[in-house]
Structure formats: structure tokens, C-alpha cells
Amino acid sequence: DLLTTIKRVKESMKRRT
């Protein structure tokens, strides 16, 4: 799912400082 992927990527980017 694109939405799921975007959500995961968003979370990953947020965790990446």
C-alpha cells in the first residue's frame, strides 16, 4: 500500500535526526 509505505517513510525520516 502506498499509504502504508509513506507512513513508514515519514516515521523513519522523523526518527532520523
From Swiss-Prot:
It is found in: Secreted. Transmembrane segments: none annotated. The modification Threonine amide is found at residue 17. It comes from the Eukaryota. Keywords: Amidation, Secreted, Toxin. Its main location: secreted. The keyword Plastid does not apply. One of its GO terms (molecular function) is toxin activity. Expressed by the venom gland. Signal peptide: none annotated. GO terms for cellular component: extracellular region. Belongs to the cationic peptide 04 (cupiennin) family. 07 subfamily. This is Cupiennin-7a. It comes from Cupiennius salei. The lineage of its organism: Eukaryota, Metazoa, Ecdysozoa, Arthropoda, Chelicerata.
